[in-house]
Protein backbone atom coordinates (compact mmCIF):
# COMPACT_ATOMS: atom_id res chain seq x y z
CA UNK A 1 0.00 0.00 0.00
CA UNK A 2 2.85 2.39 0.88
CA UNK A 3 4.55 1.57 -2.43
CA UNK A 4 1.32 2.30 -4.30
CA UNK A 5 0.97 5.68 -2.55
CA UNK A 6 4.57 6.55 -3.44
CA UNK A 7 3.99 5.69 -7.11
CA UNK A 8 0.83 7.81 -7.18
CA UNK A 9 2.67 10.72 -5.53
CA UNK A 10 5.58 10.58 -8.01
CA UNK A 11 3.17 10.35 -10.93
CA UNK A 12 1.38 13.44 -9.65
CA UNK A 13 4.63 15.38 -9.32
CA UNK A 14 5.71 14.43 -12.83
CA UNK A 15 2.42 15.77 -14.17
CA UNK A 16 2.91 19.06 -12.35
CA UNK A 17 6.37 19.81 -13.79
CA UNK A 18 5.29 20.42 -17.41
CA UNK A 19 2.33 22.50 -16.23
CA UNK A 20 4.69 24.78 -14.33
CA UNK A 21 6.86 25.29 -17.42
CA UNK A 22 3.80 25.96 -19.55
CA UNK A 23 2.59 28.57 -17.06
CA UNK A 24 5.81 30.63 -17.22
CA UNK A 25 5.30 34.02 -18.90
CA UNK A 26 6.02 34.51 -22.60
CA UNK A 27 5.84 38.26 -23.10
CA UNK A 28 7.55 41.62 -23.50
CA UNK A 29 6.59 44.38 -21.04
CA UNK A 30 7.49 47.92 -22.15
CA UNK A 31 9.03 49.76 -19.18
CA UNK A 32 10.23 52.96 -20.83
CA UNK A 33 9.02 54.92 -23.86
CA UNK A 34 7.70 58.36 -24.79
CA UNK A 35 4.11 57.32 -25.58
CA UNK A 36 1.37 55.03 -24.32
CA UNK A 37 -2.17 54.84 -23.01
CA UNK A 38 -3.13 57.09 -20.06
CA UNK A 39 -1.66 55.62 -16.88
CA UNK A 40 0.40 56.46 -13.81
CA UNK A 41 3.57 55.48 -15.67
CA UNK A 42 6.11 58.16 -16.59
CA UNK A 43 7.14 58.93 -20.17
CA UNK A 44 10.64 59.67 -21.34
CA UNK A 45 12.78 59.51 -24.46
CA UNK A 46 14.43 56.12 -24.67
CA UNK A 47 13.58 52.45 -24.50
CA UNK A 48 13.47 49.60 -22.02
CA UNK A 49 11.55 46.33 -21.91
CA UNK A 50 11.40 43.20 -19.78
CA UNK A 51 11.48 40.03 -21.86
CA UNK A 52 10.18 36.83 -20.26
CA UNK A 53 10.48 33.55 -22.12
CA UNK A 54 10.89 29.90 -21.11
CA UNK A 55 11.68 30.84 -17.54
CA UNK A 56 14.27 33.51 -18.45
CA UNK A 57 13.88 37.15 -17.38
CA UNK A 58 15.88 39.54 -19.56
CA UNK A 59 16.03 43.31 -19.21
CA UNK A 60 16.54 44.84 -22.65
CA UNK A 61 17.93 48.40 -22.34
CA UNK A 62 17.26 50.76 -19.44
CA UNK A 63 15.69 53.92 -20.86
CA UNK A 64 16.96 57.48 -20.88
CA UNK A 65 16.47 58.76 -17.32
CA UNK A 66 17.37 57.11 -14.02
CA UNK A 67 14.37 58.46 -12.09
CA UNK A 68 11.76 57.71 -14.75
CA UNK A 69 13.09 54.19 -15.23
CA UNK A 70 13.16 53.54 -11.47
CA UNK A 71 9.61 54.87 -11.01
CA UNK A 72 8.22 52.73 -13.81
CA UNK A 73 10.00 49.62 -12.56
CA UNK A 74 8.42 50.14 -9.14
CA UNK A 75 4.95 50.90 -10.53
CA UNK A 76 5.05 47.82 -12.76
CA UNK A 77 6.23 45.75 -9.76
CA UNK A 78 9.23 44.39 -11.66
CA UNK A 79 11.79 42.68 -9.43
CA UNK A 80 15.22 43.48 -10.87
CA UNK A 81 16.86 41.15 -8.36
CA UNK A 82 15.51 38.12 -10.24
CA UNK A 83 16.86 39.06 -13.68
CA UNK A 84 18.85 36.39 -15.50
CA UNK A 85 20.77 39.00 -17.45
CA UNK A 86 20.64 42.46 -19.03
CA UNK A 87 21.15 43.33 -22.70
CA UNK A 88 22.31 46.83 -23.63
CA UNK A 89 21.64 47.33 -27.32
CA UNK A 90 24.16 50.14 -27.85
CA UNK A 91 26.04 52.94 -26.15
CA UNK A 92 23.54 55.82 -26.41
CA UNK A 93 22.30 57.41 -23.20
CA UNK A 94 18.61 56.93 -24.00
CA UNK A 95 19.21 53.18 -23.63
CA UNK A 96 21.63 53.21 -20.68
CA UNK A 97 20.12 55.93 -18.43
CA UNK A 98 18.66 53.49 -15.89
CA UNK A 99 21.60 51.11 -15.69
CA UNK A 100 22.84 52.61 -12.42
CA UNK A 101 19.47 51.79 -10.83
CA UNK A 102 19.64 48.22 -12.13
CA UNK A 103 23.07 47.82 -10.53
CA UNK A 104 21.82 49.21 -7.23
CA UNK A 105 19.18 46.48 -7.17
CA UNK A 106 21.27 43.69 -8.68
CA UNK A 107 24.98 44.58 -8.58
CA UNK A 108 26.25 41.26 -9.93
CA UNK A 109 23.81 40.73 -12.79
CA UNK A 110 25.39 39.68 -16.07
CA UNK A 111 25.26 42.46 -18.67
CA UNK A 112 25.72 41.89 -22.39
CA UNK A 113 26.82 44.90 -24.43
CA UNK A 114 28.44 45.39 -27.83
CA UNK A 115 32.21 45.48 -27.99
CA UNK A 116 33.14 48.99 -29.03
CA UNK A 117 36.19 51.15 -28.45
CA UNK A 118 35.58 53.78 -25.79
CA UNK A 119 32.28 52.28 -24.59
CA UNK A 120 31.56 50.11 -21.54
CA UNK A 121 35.19 50.42 -20.44
CA UNK A 122 36.67 49.16 -23.72
CA UNK A 123 40.06 50.83 -24.39
CA UNK A 124 41.52 51.49 -27.84
CA UNK A 125 43.38 48.51 -29.29
CA UNK A 126 47.22 48.70 -29.07
CA UNK A 127 47.53 49.57 -32.81
CA UNK A 128 44.92 52.33 -32.46
CA UNK A 129 46.62 53.65 -29.32
CA UNK A 130 49.96 53.69 -31.12
CA UNK A 131 48.45 55.70 -33.98
CA UNK A 132 46.94 58.19 -31.53
CA UNK A 133 50.21 58.69 -29.71
CA UNK A 134 52.67 58.85 -32.63
CA UNK A 135 55.48 61.33 -32.14
CA UNK A 136 55.66 64.54 -34.15
CA UNK A 137 58.99 66.24 -34.81
CA UNK A 138 59.31 69.78 -33.56
CA UNK A 139 56.53 69.64 -30.97
CA UNK A 140 57.27 71.43 -27.69
CA UNK A 141 57.56 69.27 -24.55
CA UNK A 142 54.41 70.66 -22.92
CA UNK A 143 52.32 69.45 -25.90
CA UNK A 144 53.61 65.86 -25.87
CA UNK A 145 51.17 63.19 -24.69
CA UNK A 146 52.29 61.70 -21.36
CA UNK A 147 55.48 63.80 -21.43
CA UNK A 148 56.71 61.77 -24.39
CA UNK A 149 56.51 58.48 -22.47
CA UNK A 150 53.08 57.01 -23.25
CA UNK A 151 51.94 53.77 -21.60
CA UNK A 152 51.90 50.55 -23.61
CA UNK A 153 48.11 50.39 -23.33
CA UNK A 154 45.50 53.09 -22.84
CA UNK A 155 42.85 52.47 -20.18
CA UNK A 156 39.32 53.87 -20.12
CA UNK A 157 37.02 53.44 -17.15
CA UNK A 158 33.34 52.60 -17.49
CA UNK A 159 30.71 55.01 -16.09
CA UNK A 160 29.62 51.98 -14.03
CA UNK A 161 32.75 51.09 -12.01
CA UNK A 162 33.16 47.45 -11.10
CA UNK A 163 30.48 46.24 -13.49
CA UNK A 164 31.46 43.15 -15.43
CA UNK A 165 30.23 43.58 -18.97
CA UNK A 166 30.24 40.61 -21.32
CA UNK A 167 31.20 42.34 -24.56
CA UNK A 168 29.87 40.84 -27.79
CA UNK A 169 31.64 41.19 -31.14
CA UNK A 170 29.56 38.73 -33.18
CA UNK A 171 26.10 37.17 -33.18
CA UNK A 172 25.80 34.42 -30.58
CA UNK A 173 23.34 32.10 -28.85
CA UNK A 174 23.30 33.02 -25.14
CA UNK A 175 20.67 30.51 -23.98
CA UNK A 176 18.66 27.83 -25.78
CA UNK A 177 16.60 29.64 -28.41
CA UNK A 178 17.85 33.11 -27.37
CA UNK A 179 20.28 34.91 -29.66
CA UNK A 180 22.12 38.22 -29.63
CA UNK A 181 22.29 39.59 -33.17
CA UNK A 182 25.18 41.97 -33.72
CA UNK A 183 25.09 44.53 -36.54
CA UNK A 184 27.08 47.68 -37.40
CA UNK A 185 25.75 51.04 -38.56
CA UNK A 186 27.02 52.73 -41.70
CA UNK A 187 24.66 55.70 -41.33
CA UNK A 188 25.87 59.28 -41.07
CA UNK A 189 26.08 60.29 -37.40
CA UNK A 190 26.31 56.71 -36.10
CA UNK A 191 29.03 55.39 -38.40
CA UNK A 192 30.51 52.11 -37.10
CA UNK A 193 28.19 52.06 -34.06
CA UNK A 194 27.70 48.45 -32.93
CA UNK A 195 24.22 47.35 -31.92
CA UNK A 196 22.78 44.20 -30.35
CA UNK A 197 19.26 42.91 -30.92
CA UNK A 198 17.61 39.99 -29.11
CA UNK A 199 16.12 37.21 -31.24
CA UNK A 200 13.82 34.66 -29.62
CA UNK A 201 13.02 31.41 -31.43
CA UNK A 202 9.30 30.69 -31.05
CA UNK A 203 7.01 28.06 -32.63
CA UNK A 204 5.80 30.73 -35.09
CA UNK A 205 9.22 32.12 -36.00
CA UNK A 206 11.58 34.68 -34.51
CA UNK A 207 10.41 37.40 -32.15
CA UNK A 208 12.98 40.16 -32.58
CA UNK A 209 13.51 42.83 -29.91
CA UNK A 210 15.43 45.87 -31.15
CA UNK A 211 16.71 48.96 -29.37
CA UNK A 212 17.16 51.68 -31.99
CA UNK A 213 17.98 49.91 -35.28
CA UNK A 214 20.79 52.32 -36.18
CA UNK A 215 22.29 49.80 -38.64
CA UNK A 216 18.91 49.69 -40.43
CA UNK A 217 16.01 47.46 -39.45
CA UNK A 218 16.17 45.42 -42.67
CA UNK A 219 19.88 44.79 -42.15
CA UNK A 220 19.06 43.54 -38.65
CA UNK A 221 16.32 41.29 -40.05
CA UNK A 222 18.82 39.88 -42.54
CA UNK A 223 21.31 39.12 -39.77
CA UNK A 224 18.63 37.56 -37.55
CA UNK A 225 17.37 35.30 -40.33
CA UNK A 226 20.48 33.12 -39.94
CA UNK A 227 18.70 31.64 -36.91
CA UNK A 228 15.27 31.27 -38.50
CA UNK A 229 14.07 32.51 -41.87
CA UNK A 230 10.55 32.77 -40.49
CA UNK A 231 10.11 36.12 -38.73
CA UNK A 232 7.05 36.45 -36.53
CA UNK A 233 7.24 39.87 -34.87
CA UNK A 234 9.44 42.91 -34.29
CA UNK A 235 9.33 44.76 -30.96
CA UNK A 236 11.10 48.06 -30.21
CA UNK A 237 12.65 51.03 -31.99
CA UNK A 238 12.83 50.87 -35.80
CA UNK A 239 14.58 54.24 -36.33
CA UNK A 240 12.28 55.41 -39.09
CA UNK A 241 11.64 58.75 -37.39
CA UNK A 242 14.18 60.56 -39.59
CA UNK A 243 13.29 58.85 -42.88
CA UNK A 244 11.20 60.34 -45.69
CA UNK A 245 7.57 59.27 -46.07
CA UNK A 246 8.55 57.30 -49.17
CA UNK A 247 11.35 55.48 -47.35
CA UNK A 248 9.07 54.65 -44.43
CA UNK A 249 6.35 53.27 -46.68
CA UNK A 250 8.89 51.15 -48.55
CA UNK A 251 10.27 49.61 -45.35
CA UNK A 252 6.82 48.94 -43.88
CA UNK A 253 5.63 47.31 -47.10
CA UNK A 254 8.81 45.20 -47.17
CA UNK A 255 7.92 43.85 -43.73
CA UNK A 256 4.93 42.19 -45.39
CA UNK A 257 6.09 41.41 -48.92
CA UNK A 258 9.78 40.61 -48.42
CA UNK A 259 10.03 39.45 -44.82
CA UNK A 260 6.52 38.03 -44.34
CA UNK A 261 6.34 39.35 -40.78
CA UNK A 262 3.03 38.65 -39.04
CA UNK A 263 2.99 41.31 -36.32
CA UNK A 264 4.83 44.51 -35.37
CA UNK A 265 5.02 46.19 -31.95
CA UNK A 266 7.08 49.27 -32.80
CA UNK A 267 8.21 51.86 -30.27
CA UNK A 268 10.73 54.56 -29.38
CA UNK A 269 12.38 56.01 -32.52
CA UNK A 270 9.96 54.45 -35.01
CA UNK A 271 8.19 57.79 -35.57
CA UNK A 272 4.54 58.78 -35.77
CA UNK A 273 4.22 58.55 -39.55
CA UNK A 274 5.68 55.04 -39.44
CA UNK A 275 3.13 54.07 -36.79
CA UNK A 276 0.34 55.24 -39.12
CA UNK A 277 1.83 53.20 -41.97
CA UNK A 278 2.14 50.12 -39.74
CA UNK A 279 -1.53 50.50 -38.81
CA UNK A 280 -2.43 50.71 -42.50
CA UNK A 281 -0.42 47.66 -43.55
CA UNK A 282 -0.82 45.40 -40.51
CA UNK A 283 -4.25 46.42 -39.21
CA UNK A 284 -5.04 44.54 -36.01
CA UNK A 285 -1.63 42.84 -36.23
CA UNK A 286 -0.06 46.21 -35.41
CA UNK A 287 0.36 45.91 -31.64
CA UNK A 288 0.30 49.28 -29.87
CA UNK A 289 3.33 49.05 -27.62
CA UNK A 290 3.64 52.19 -25.53
CA UNK A 291 4.92 52.28 -21.97
CA UNK A 292 3.22 49.67 -19.81
CA UNK A 293 1.95 47.56 -22.72
CA UNK A 294 2.49 43.79 -22.68
CA UNK A 295 3.19 42.02 -25.98
CA UNK A 296 2.57 38.27 -26.04
CA UNK A 297 5.21 35.93 -27.50
CA UNK A 298 4.15 32.56 -28.98
CA UNK A 299 5.22 29.53 -26.95
Region locations from a protein language model:
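Conserved beta-strand hairpin/beta-sheet module of binuclear metal-dependent hydrolase folds
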Residues: 27-76, 191-210
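Bacterial N-terminal signal peptides
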Residues: 6-15
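Active-site metal-binding motif and surrounding structural segment of the metallo-beta-lactamase
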Residues: 67-116, 225-235, 239
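Cap/insert and terminal regions of metallo-dependent hydrolase folds
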Residues: 110, 197, 203-294
Amino acid sequence: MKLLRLIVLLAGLSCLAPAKAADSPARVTVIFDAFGKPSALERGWGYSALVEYKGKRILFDTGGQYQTFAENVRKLKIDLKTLDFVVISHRHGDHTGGLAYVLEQNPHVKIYAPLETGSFGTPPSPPAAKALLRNAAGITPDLRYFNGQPPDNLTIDSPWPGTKFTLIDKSIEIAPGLFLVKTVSDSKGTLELNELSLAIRTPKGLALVVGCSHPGIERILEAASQYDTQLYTIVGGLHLVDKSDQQVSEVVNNFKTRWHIERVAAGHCTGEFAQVELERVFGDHHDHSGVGEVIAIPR
